From Swiss-Prot:
Gene Ontology, cellular component aspect: cytosolic large ribosomal subunit
Pfam families xrefs: Ribosomal_L27
Organism this protein belongs to: Pectobacterium atrosepticum (strain SCRI 1043 / ATCC BAA-672)
Family under the similarity heading: Belongs to the bacterial ribosomal protein bL27 family.
Protein known as: Large ribosomal subunit protein bL27
Xref: InterPro entries: Ribosomal_bL27, Ribosomal_bL27_CS
Record carries keyword Transmembrane: no
Record keywords: Ribonucleoprotein, Ribosomal protein
Gene coding for it: rpmA
Keyword Ligase appears in the UniProt entry: no
Length: 85
């Protein structure tokens, strides 16, 4: 009788969904109040003027205007601000 012993089971075969992080509105783009600018883990980008920071470090616009990226301070941190159009 042609039989084959059953193969063992594996503990692999899972993968998590992508988190969809990153910059959603780039420099010079127009935004409305409440628009998400960056989704991030930790503060890769810091909130500048007219930008709020959510509990998961998501940066969002507090007013309407244009997105502006800038590097400031002694530690060369990246700040995102909203400037009036």
């Amino acid at each position: 009788m042609a039989h084959k012993k059953a193969g063992g089971s594996t503990r692999n075969g899972r993968d998590s969904n992508a988190q969809r992080l990153g910059v959603k509105r780039f420099g010079g783009e127009s935004v409305l109040a409440g628009n998400i600018i960056v989704r991030q883990r930790g503060t890769k980008f810091h909130a500048g003027t007219n930008v709020g920071c959510g509990k998961d470090h998501t940066l969002f616009a507090l007013t309407d205007g244009k997105v502006q990226f800038e590097v400031k301070g002694p530690k060369n941190r990246k700040f995102i601000s909203i400037v009036a159009e």
